[in-house]
Amino acid sequence: MKANFGKKEGEYSRLVSKSSNKLLNSLWEKKQIPEEGWSEHTLDLFLSWLSSHDTNNRVDMIPVGAGEREGRVLTPLVQRLHSNLTHGIGRSGNLLEIQPKALGSSMLACLSNEFAKHALHLLGLHAVKSCIVVPLCTGMSLSLCMTSWRRRRPKAKYVVWLRIDQKSSLKSIYHAGFEPIIVEPIRDRDSLITDVETVNRIIEQRGEEILCVMTTTSCFAPRSPDNVEAISAICAAHDVPHLVNNAYGLQSEETIRKIAAAHECGRVDAVVQSLDKNFQVPVGGAVIAAFKQNHIQSIAQSYPGRASSVPSRDLVLTLLYQGQSAFLEPFGKQKQMFLKMRRKLISFAENIGECVYEVPENEISSAMTLSTIPPAKQTLFGSILFAKGITGARVVTSSQSKTTIEGCEFINFGSHTTEQHGGYLNIACSVGMTDHELEELFTRLTSSYAKFVRELAKEDERINSSGRRIPINESFDMEND
């Protein structure tokens, strides 16, 4: 039966097509996160629109690929997973360059960079001039920045690295072909803070041998975020690049304020942040931000080859889905959740005879002492928490043993300092944590701790009565309290 479509229906069809095109074209013209989030249907439409710009997906001609890379994908499932965007981003030797036969993929890369900059502006880094989304982890992104500065400082051999007991930032220095000069933090009550005087002295002594200073603004308590304002002033005075490892620091208003202030009072050449930790997307990407346009240009030109567009795609889709208001909401929620977590941790600590470190500048991580658990049993307690489904929490013990990473020896690795301590528990509140998760965390933590200390007491009784030590993990039921 022939469908009876008249003039009215035809006009409606043209209106729908016109509205869709207007929405997509408006996005491309503005290159900003929309006020309101988009539906999944609209996101599918957006991806189809982008992929239709790549030559291998054109409908107005049959492409004939005569090169070594023509967007060919054998498996239909893989092609669908990538939404027919198979060319990647950039051209050989420049991540920002447009690929003529992959216009849609290049548009996606452009949108991701502009969205990242807009997101940082919304969070408070208003002076950021340029961003680039790279398909690299935070450590590799740090390495890319350092590699790009090699020509600017041909005599450089070293990177001044403020100790943070996290392997990837240290490895990034060696991967870029440099060696670290390690600066230990200093104690300020409970906090481990930046040794500014030592950094200044090293730069004065080494001068052109220093490639850059790498500071860290997101870390586990009791380490405090580095004093980026003071370091930026030193770097400006001595004309030394300043690289900020801001892995998950976008979640902290105080960290955002400190980075903005560092730019105002001194020198900040690049700020690196993780996509998955800040934007709730899968692991695999980072945002490199700069306060000068040419700083990003040089970093983009140091990337060898083309790059995967997957992290760019995931970021763009996530920000389109959220819109501006929904994007900011989890960051405001994180601050409330952190304060709530800290109150509950202090209450729990007081009930069991422990205390919580006072690290006022760290708005993401907290640390509680474990003096009521023997040092030899603290690691086991951490394992039990993991077995109970508490992921991300860490038990940090203290010892004189040495850990070697890339030839560097560290005493007490994991503690950010050589100082001895009684052991502590780290927990963090990151973007996306819910009230239910927080309540369940303390329910499991409370019950696990109570049973653990009961088993410790029973073990002591067995030792006293029989002289035979029965390991606590033999008697601790991992499944049932």
Curated annotation (Swiss-Prot):
It is found in: Cytoplasm. One of its GO terms (molecular function) is identical protein binding. It catalyses: O-phospho-L-seryl-tRNA(Sec) + selenophosphate + H2O = L-selenocysteinyl-tRNA(Sec) + 2 phosphate. Its EC number is 2.9.1.2. Its cofactor is pyridoxal 5'-phosphate. The modification N6-(pyridoxal phosphate)lysine is found at residue 277. Pathway: Aminoacyl-tRNA biosynthesis; selenocysteinyl-tRNA(Sec) biosynthesis; selenocysteinyl-tRNA(Sec) from L-seryl-tRNA(Sec) (archaeal/eukaryal route): step 2/2. The record marks 68 as: May act as a substrate filter by repelling compounds with a negatively charged alpha-carboxylate. Transmembrane segments: none annotated. Converts O-phosphoseryl-tRNA(Sec) to selenocysteinyl-tRNA(Sec) required for selenoprotein biosynthesis. Homotetramer formed by a catalytic dimer and a non-catalytic dimer serving as a binding platform that orients tRNASec for catalysis. Each tetramer binds the CCA ends of two tRNAs which point to the active sites of the catalytic dimer. This is O-phosphoseryl-tRNA(Sec) selenium transferase. It comes from Caenorhabditis elegans. The gene is secs-1.
